[in-house]
Regions:
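Serine-hydrolase catalytic core recognition
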Residues: 217-218, 280, 286, 434-737
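Generic alpha-helix initiation/capping and coil-helix boundary signal
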Residues: 2-4, 146, 494, 683
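Structural signature of Gram-negative outer-membrane beta-barrels, strongest in the C-terminal barrel
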Residues: 427-428, 549
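N-terminal signal peptide c-region/cleavage motif recognized by signal peptidases
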Residues: 6-8
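Beta-propeller folds
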Residues: 2, 11-424, 430-434, 442-443, ...
Length: 737
């Protein structure tokens, strides 16, 4: 009894969280995050880029040597005279591993009172002298700098420009508009696309996307900040409708000439994963049909744009989703690494261009097939996923990568020897590790966390796996009353597949009480909610709700990432069906627990999770008492072509699948309290989803609640994010507790 009272007294003496403490955008959020170390590679050397200076870190003993201070950097830049003051060293760069150079961006005053500019400035921190500066418009976007030539590509008002190191600016295009876009991301950032320009290794040529979207309808977004509200266009190709047409150009600054890759008619095709050959002469591109069930790796002559041939083909009865460009071996330009899920899990394959062959066709996973036009050797294999490639060890001729080979919830750092596929683990084999590698691959910076480790950063020698700890952060929540967070597994609705969950129990949990329970759900592809990192990846809002007496349950259903192709594509052509079956297995598990109040179950999610929340409320109206659906998809025919058709096919080809996932048709099933929340200017799940659902509910005589954030897009940021979670919390307080 004395011991129990002591524990209760300790708990009562600890602090309680506010939403500002727990949410990005909260006024005290950063004060309660684990201590961090901000770093950058300077060639082979690791540098701490701190608030007030930069320090080189000794890999042998972890000691630090000052390279320069913030005040010195501002002095060298002439801050306050020709440019703005740099307020921290967090974002400085070291553009040349062979030179003592530091680079940063400062604001310029513009020439002759012209428009404001930005200046990319390089300083020699040994001599304190400026090496060079590169000025460009302050409103430029899509910045892409070549580390070889130091030329800069950028986009302004949908046109593409190149500025050389010497300051000469050239317009690559002049007819850019909302209908015709140059140098920007295409295909709505699907297929791993993160940018629209691609420098050759020597920096003397620039490949770029040109996207004609004149045939794509404008979705009307509303700007309420004008005296009388106005609309502005948002190009949005919906499933089954016309999509944009993409072509690829190659610009040579020395001649001012552009050639176009002769890829043929771009109608209903996707071009992605653009890669250059090491000799700057060839361009490789992966091309997909609109059905996304066939991909070809194609080679082009960069000088003429001529198509030289297909290197590799891959097809699958559901879909193929290439996400990564080619990685040529630094020691052998005839070989490259290719990533593919052709055998059921994302793995690495070694392609040898020096060994062309008559096309070799092989059967692959789930009735798929591939055709190899050069020799291909699997480099990794197994029922696990390569999550990220980090770089190469040049001396040992190995590749470094992260995978979940040890456990589906983990991420660990390995190196694999290219000549024979021998793998070596480079970390402690626990938790979640992410890394970055120096120039020659001799060291990896290992950033690690686990359910009990807030953050640990080490510098590891890749030759022997020995690491030097640089930081082990204390738990920033040690003075707070933190709920118990556990992790476990249940079986999926198929009866065989393991699904992993996180449970956050109420603060001061009493197993003899019954608690209101909220299921937080996402459930879609390219995301997961549970992993073996700090607090099993628990979100701040879950901690806040546990503090208010709720039990939180989070389950990664089939359809989510990092579990292999079969785990993901089981949802094909009927999104929401298998996902809900798995979530209901979670409900069945919860109902078996004596401390879960089955009469007070709620559900909340955002985006795909908003779709899942609404679907669960309407499909199982007697199970869920309250729900909050954020930015939901309501009808997949209103969603974008690329994502929607990959998982659902076109509405014309899959009418039953689209009908089954159309939540408007279930509007009459609503019994519990459902609040729908959207950003009024959402360009991802456009407002038509939620507004059409409200109309369907009116027609059906049901009563959902609705709230919108004018001016916000798909996600609320800053103080709006705190406001959002205050509203979500209050809804459950009003209707679930």
């Amino acid at each position: 009894m004395v011991s129990l009272l002591s524990v209760l007294a300790m708990a009562q003496g600890k602090k309680s969280f506010t939403l500002d403490d727990l949410l990005p955008g909260g006024s005290t959020y950063h004060q309660l995050q684990p201590q961090n170390l901000y770093t950058a590679w300077w060639g082979n050397r690791l540098v701490e880029t701190d608030l007030d200076g930069s320090n080189e870190i000794n890999p042998k003993n972890g000691s630090k040597k000052v390279l320069f201070t913030l005040s010195q950097l501002n002095q060298w830049l002439g801050a306050g005279e020709d440019s703005s003051v740099v307020r921290s060293c967090y974002n400085v760069e070291f553009p040349d591993g062979r030179q003592p150079w530091v680079a940063t961006v400062v604001s310029g005053k513009g020439k002759n009172g012209g428009k404001p500019t930005s200046i990319y400035t390089v300083v020699d921190f040994k001599s304190g002298k400026k090496v060079w500066g590169q000025e460009y418009p302050a409103d430029a976007t899509a910045l892409d700098r070549s580390p070889s030539s130091n030329s800069l590509a950028f986009v302004r008002q949908h046109n593409l420009y190149v500025t050389t190191k010497e300051g000469q600016t050239m317009a690559v295009s002049s007819d850019g508009s909302n209908d015709l876009v140059y140098g920007e991301t295409v295909h709505r950032n699907e297929f791993g696309i993160t940018k629209g320009t691609f420098w050759s290794p020597d920096g003397k040529q620039l490949a770029f996307y040109r996207m004609d979207q004149s045939m794509v309808p404008d979705y009307p977004q509303v700007d309420i900040t004008t005296r009388i509200a106005t609309t502005y266009p948002c190009k949005y190709p919906m499933a089954g409708e016309k999509m944009h047409k993409v072509t690829v150009g190659v610009f040579t600054p020395a001649t001012g000439r552009t050639v176009w890759l002769q890829a043929g008619d771009p109608t209903d095709r996707y071009f992605t994963n653009i890669s250059w050959s090491p000799d700057n002469r060839k361009i490789y591109m992966i091309e997909l049909n609109r059905d996304q069930n066939r991909a070809e790796l194609v080679r082009y002559d960069a000088a003429t744009g001529k198509k030289e041939g297909v290197i590799y083909e891959e097809e699958h009865p559901k879909y193929v989703e290439p996400m990564h460009g080619l990685l040529f071996l630094p020691w052998d330009s005839s070989k490259f690494i290719y990533q593919s899920q052709r055998d059921g899990y994302n793995h690495l394959y070694l392609f040898d261009l020096s060994k062309p062959q008559a096309p070799q066709r092989h059967k692959t996973f789930q009735g798929g097939a591939c055709e190899e036009h050069v020799e291909v050797t699997p480099l990794t294999s197994g029922e696990w996923v390569v999550k990220e490639v980090l770089g190469f060890d040049l001396k040992e001729k190995s590749l470094l990568f992260c995978s979940n080979e040890i456990h589906p919830l983990q991420s660990n750092i390995y190196k694999v020897r290219v000549k024979d596929g021998q793998r070596t683990l480079l970390d402690n084999g626990e938790g979640v590790h992410y890394g970055s590698v120096n120039a020659d691959g001799t060291y990896v910076e290992d950033r690690y966390s686990s359910p009990t480790v807030a953050r640990s950063i080490s510098l590891t020698d890749t030759r022997n796996g020995k690491g030097r700890n640089l930081l082990t952060a204390e738990d920033p929540w040690k003075d707070y009353n933190v709920p118990e967070i556990t992790c476990g597994s249940i079986k999926a609705a198929d009866g065989t597949t393991d699904l992993y969950y996180r449970m956050v129990k109420p603060v001061d949990f009493d197993p003899n009480k019954k608690y209101p329970t909220v299921i937080y759900v996402y459930g879609g592809s390219h995301a997961h909610n549970v992993e073996a990192s700090r607090n099993y990846l628990a979100r701040g809002w879950e901690i806040y709700m546990a503090q208010k007496g709720y039990l939180l349950f989070i389950l990664d259903n089939r359809g989510s990432e990092h579990r292999g192709l079969a785990f993901e594509n089981v949802t094909f052509r009927h999104l929401g069906v298998e996902e809900m079956k798995d979530q209901m297995e979670g409900v069945r598990f919860l109902k078996s627990l004596p401390y879960v109040d089955a009469d007070r179950m709620g559900v909340h999610g955002w985006s795909f999770g908003g779709f899942m929340t609404t679907n669960l409320m309407l499909t199982y109206p007697d199970v869920f008492k309250a729900g909050v659906a954020g930015g939901p998809v309501v009808d997949w025919q209103y969603y974008e072509v690329m994502y929607g058709e990959r998982y659902m096919d076109r509405p014309q080809d899959n009418p039953e699948g689209y009908k089954g996932s159309n939540l408007r048709l279930k509007a009459g099933n609503l019994k519990g309290k459902l609040q729908v929340i959207i950003g009024y200017n959402d360009p991802v799940c456009v407002p038509q989803h939620s507004l059409s659902f409200l109309r369907a509910c009116i027609d059906a005589g049901t009563q959902p609640d609705f709230f919108t954030y004018p001016g916000d897009e798909h996600n609320m940021m800053g103080k709006d994010r705190v406001h959002l979670h205050e509203r979500i919390t209050q809804y459950f307080e009003d209707y679930l507790k």
